[in-house]
């Protein structure tokens, strides 16, 4: 498992290339989504946004398929772990919407899994506070210095500390391994509060 989890330089370069192409598709998606909202598209909903992000990824060179079904959650649906919109359940998306988009692609060179949260209008003070605390957690984790052999369980606290100080939390892991043109969820490493999560986070892991 560890031999697969620790990527070689060819795999790492392929993953960088995959994320560049994925980034193009995601940028196009958010531009399109904001345009639809500005123009007042009343048919805009979670389901057709999921279809749109898949079609934009498919335009990229070396695209194979989705790495998992896209998760598009508007408002309260964004808090449902692994939510999947259907044509019947899909909530409308408007200028007042907070959108969570969790999606990814399988490319010949690598695999992506990207989660982003956007407000399409003017967020409330509480929404800004929550978003800022999550962002501060991302920055704390990204800039953390830790000794060799530190497991993801210990690092998870960096991501949650600013939420905890406000009495907030999220019932989900912070991060998981991603395969190089393989499974989008790859172990044994993860960054989560699970006590059995003792695999050290090592150079070359994604």
Q: Each PLM stretch: what is its role?
A:
Residues 1-206:
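Active-site neighborhoods and metal-handling regions in enzymes and metal-associated proteins
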């Amino acid at each position: 498992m560890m031999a697969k989890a620790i990527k070689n330089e060819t795999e790492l370069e392929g993953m960088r290339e995959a994320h560049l192409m994925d980034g193009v598709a995601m940028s196009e998606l958010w531009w399109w989504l904001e345009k639809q909202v500005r123009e007042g598209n009343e048919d805009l909903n979670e389901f057709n946004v999921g279809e749109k992000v898949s079609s934009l990824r498919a335009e990229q060179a070396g695209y194979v398929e989705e790495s998992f079904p896209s998760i598009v959650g508007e408002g309260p649906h964004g808090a449902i772990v692994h939510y999947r919109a259907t044509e019947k359940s899909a909530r409308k998306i408007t200028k007042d919407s907070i959108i969570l988009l969790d999606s990814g692609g399988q490319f010949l060179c690598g695999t992506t899994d990207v989660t982003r949260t956007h407000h399409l209008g003017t967020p409330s003070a509480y929404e800004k506070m929550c978003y800022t605390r999550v962002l501060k957690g991302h920055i704390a984790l990204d800039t953390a210095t830790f000794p060799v052999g530190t497991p993801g369980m210990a690092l998870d606290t960096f991501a949650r500390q600013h939420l905890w100080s406000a009495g907030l939390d999220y019932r989900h892991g912070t991060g998981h391994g991603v395969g190089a043109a393989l499974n989008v969820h790859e172990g044994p490493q993860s960054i989560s509060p699970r006590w059995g999560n003792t695999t050290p986070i090592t150079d070359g892991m994604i």
